[in-house]
UniProtKB/Swiss-Prot annotation:
Residue positions binding substrate: 107, 198, 200, 265, 267, 269, 345, 410, 414
Keyword entries, A-Z: Transferase
Recorded GO MF terms: transferase activity, transferring alkyl or aryl (other than methyl) groups
One Pfam family in the UniProt entry: Trp_DMAT
NCBIfam families xref list: arom_pren_DMATS (TIGR03429)
Gene Ontology biological process terms in this record: alkaloid metabolic process
Protein name, per record: Aromatic prenyl transferase PC-22
Signal peptide positions (record): none
UniProt key word Transferase: yes
């Protein structure tokens, strides 16, 4: 009788790969090309084997079907092209680090896309996200899952069929901008005890259709559902700053968690091609409106990180925009907060991955995360063994930084989801 290999010699990813029966070749394609990187990231967070199985099974059941038909390269005549990543992939991975020994978490971002997206059957790509959320509502393990905020904000900030017909008739969309109609995407936080679902909305289409300025549209929709649980003065300070400094545009995003309203934060996102320290400082302090000790301590940490990374400063948009992507920013407000929590997303794609990794390693050590700092570059190479870090510019997509009095330094690093499709410049 032949000997049996020890079951402990196989990882959860390898075990699942052996026995998975895929509904279609499309879903098998994405499992083969993207699940292994996700498995490596999950292990990086010191998840238990049971959690690895759980999260990978969730990825198979509820993430891949959102885009399984989609291919991450140009397809002539395709009616819809994803806009959530610079690599052209419809999904993105990130790891959040906070209080490093206890709190590291993987997040998966995805744009739900039906096969009919961009066609007469689903012209503004609404179908798939509704289908996904309806299915998630039946998953018993998602104990905190709640659709109240989705139902409200999807109506308040996304277009109806009538509004879309009006937009098409008036031709207010730039014809050359293939992702101009995109209005939503999703995120999945792989937390210790369950998966938390996040929604991201882009309200510019609703603003165009209704003729309502974005500042007014966002303020009204937030007050209508949160009433006074989101501090009105804090929200007004952020909205007024963004409005007065021309920060509301087609790239403005709004997000919330699909959990009970009393617990869900809200976030406002934007982008700016002025990738300079002075611009980052202005965004961090909300135009100088917040200069308290916590804000300024966070700013000092951000400056330290900024100086360690090979950032290319740009005051204006270069001719080859894709090679010099924008800086992103966000403001998070939780129920009861009297100040917003700023977050700066430093563009990592198109920067040398070895230099980025070295800069991050140094920063992690300086803030007391010695183990992470010592292991970071080796871990990155182990996830992408076929990539030469000295030549690669595709593995890091964003490096996000935040700081709060309660949590201290909070880092979120975004990565290419599949080395099979590296971003070529």
């Amino acid at each position: 009788m032949g000997s049996l290999s020890s079951p402990t010699s196989l990882t959860p990813y390898q075990v699942l790969s052996k026995y998975k029966k895929f509904p279609s070749p499309d879903e098998e394609f994405w499992w083969d090309h993207a699940a292994s990187t996700l498995a490596d990231l999950i292990k990086w967070t010191k998840a238990t084997p049971a959690q690895e199985y759980e999260f990978l099974q969730f990825f198979y059941e509820h993430v891949i079907p959102n885009f399984s038909w989609y291919r991450p390269y140009d397809v002539p005549g395709r009616a819809w092209n994803t806009g959530i990543t610079p690599s052209g992939l419809p999904l993105e991975y990130s790891v959040n680090w906070r209080n490093i020994d206890a709190n590291a978490m993987v997040r998966v971002g995805v744009e739900p896309i039906s096969q009919f997206a961009g066609t007469a059957r689903d012209p503004y790509s609404h179908y798939k996200i509704w289908d996904t959320l309806n299915q998630l509502s039946q998953v018993k393990a998602l104990k905190s899952f709640d659709l109240e905020l989705w139902r409200h904000f999807s109506s308040a900030l996304c277009t109806s069929r009538e509004e879309e017909a009006l937009l098409d008739q008036t031709r207010t969309l730039p014809e050359s901008f293939s992702i101009a109609k995109m209005q939503h995407s999703m995120g999945f936080d792989f937390c210790d005890d369950e998966v938390i679902v996040k929604i991201y909305l882009i309200p510019n289409m609703k603003a165009r259709a209704s003729g309502t300025p974005l500042a007014e549209l966002l303020t009204g929709s937030i007050h209508a559902i949160y009433r006074d649980t989101i501090d009105r003065e804090t929200l007004a300070t952020v909205i007024n700053y963004l409005d007065s400094s021309s920060n509301f545009n087609d790239a403005t995003w709004f997000s919330f968690d699909c959990i009970p309203r009393s617990q869900s934060r809200i976030k406002l996102y934007g982008s700016d091609f002025r990738t300079t320290w002075s611009r980052a400082e202005d965004l961090w302090t909300v135009g100088g409106r917040y200069t308290d000790a916590v804000t300024m301590k966070g700013l000092a940490y951000l400056k330290e990180l900024w100086d360690l990374l090979p950032i290319q400063d740009f005051e204006t948009l270069p001719e080859q925009a894709v090679q010099n992507p924008p800086m992103l920013w966000a403001y998070e407000i939780r129920p009861g907060d009297k100040t917003p929590s700023p977050r700066i997303y430093i563009p990592g794609h198109c920067l040398n991955d070895k230099k980025v990794a070295d800069g991050l390693s140094t920063f992690f050590k300086r803030v007391g995360w010695s183990d992470l700092g010592d292991q970071y570059t080796d871990r990155l190479f182990s996830m992408f063994p076929k990539q030469d870090l000295k030549d690669s510019t595709a593995l890091h997509t964003w490096i996000a930084f935040s700081y709060t009095e309660k949590s201290g330094v909070y880092m979120n690093c975004y990565y290419l989801a599949s080395a099979s499709f590296p971003f070529k410049l």
